[in-house]
């Protein structure tokens, strides 16, 4: 489904939180949305492999990487795994790499920056916890909508029709 965050903000201005404009689109899908699953991991993407193995239909993974742009948390392998398991998208408060490959995949991926250095894969981190970045607090189960203009968050799903 295609989302227009500007229209959604006009209609639901009282119900949505707007994430600060820190993110750029790196995936092949320019708009995406769904129920979020949160994860907090710093320069380590081992836990992301486990989470992206799950069925992602209607879901968006929100990754709090502490804002670090020294190591990329998402690479082509993880993005392909997410696509295979039908995730709608990934938002990374951190960096990605292999951006030409990411742009070819039909999945939404937004992040702060790109860097060629990969993350560790020790599996250090926590999932399904409250995370806060971009002026917004994210809880697993909230609903996120993203496009090239921005990212918005709602406690309940928005009536898009």
Curated annotation (Swiss-Prot):
Swiss-Prot/TrEMBL keywords = Cytoplasm
A Gene Ontology BP annotation from the UniProt entry? negative regulation of RNA catabolic process
Is Heme one of the keywords UniProt gives this record?
Answer: no
The answer to whether the entry has keyword Cytoplasm is yes
Q: Where in the cell is it found?
A: Cytoplasm
Q: Which residues form a coiled coil?
A: none
Name the GO cellular-component terms: cytosol
Main subcellular location: cytoplasm
Under the heading Pfam families, the entry gives: RraA-like
Q: Name one GO molecular function term.
A: enzyme binding
Q: How the protein assembles, per its UniProt entry?
A: Homotrimer. Binds to both RNA-binding sites in the C-terminal region of Rne and to RhlB.
Q: Of which family is this protein a member?
A: Belongs to the RraA family.
Role description: Globally modulates RNA abundance by binding to RNase E (Rne) and regulating its endonucleolytic activity. Can modulate Rne action in a substrate-dependent manner by altering the composition of the degradosome. Modulates RNA-binding and helicase activities of the degradosome.
Q: What is this protein called?
A: Regulator of ribonuclease activity A
Which species does the entry assign this protein to? Yersinia pestis
């Amino acid at each position: 489904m295609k989302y227009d965050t500007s229209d959604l903000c006009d209609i639901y201005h009282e119900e949505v939180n707007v994430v600060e404009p820190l993110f750029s689109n790196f995936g092949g899908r320019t708009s995406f949305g769904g129920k979020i699953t949160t994860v907090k991991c710093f320069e380590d993407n081992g836990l992301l492999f486990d989470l992206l193995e799950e069925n992602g239909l209607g879901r968006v993974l929100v990754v709090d990487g502490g804002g670090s742009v020294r190591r990329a948390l998402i690479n082509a392998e993880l993005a392909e795994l997410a696509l295979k398991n039908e995730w709608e998208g990934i938002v990374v408060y951190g960096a990605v790499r292999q951006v030409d490959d990411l742009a070819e995949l039909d999945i939404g991926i937004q992040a702060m920056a790109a860097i060629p250095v990969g993350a560790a894969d020790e599996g250090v981190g926590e999932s399904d916890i409250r995370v806060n970045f971009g002026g917004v607090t994210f809880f697993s189960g909230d609903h996120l909508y993203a496009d090239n203009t921005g990212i918005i968050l709602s406690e309940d799903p928005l009536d898009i029709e």
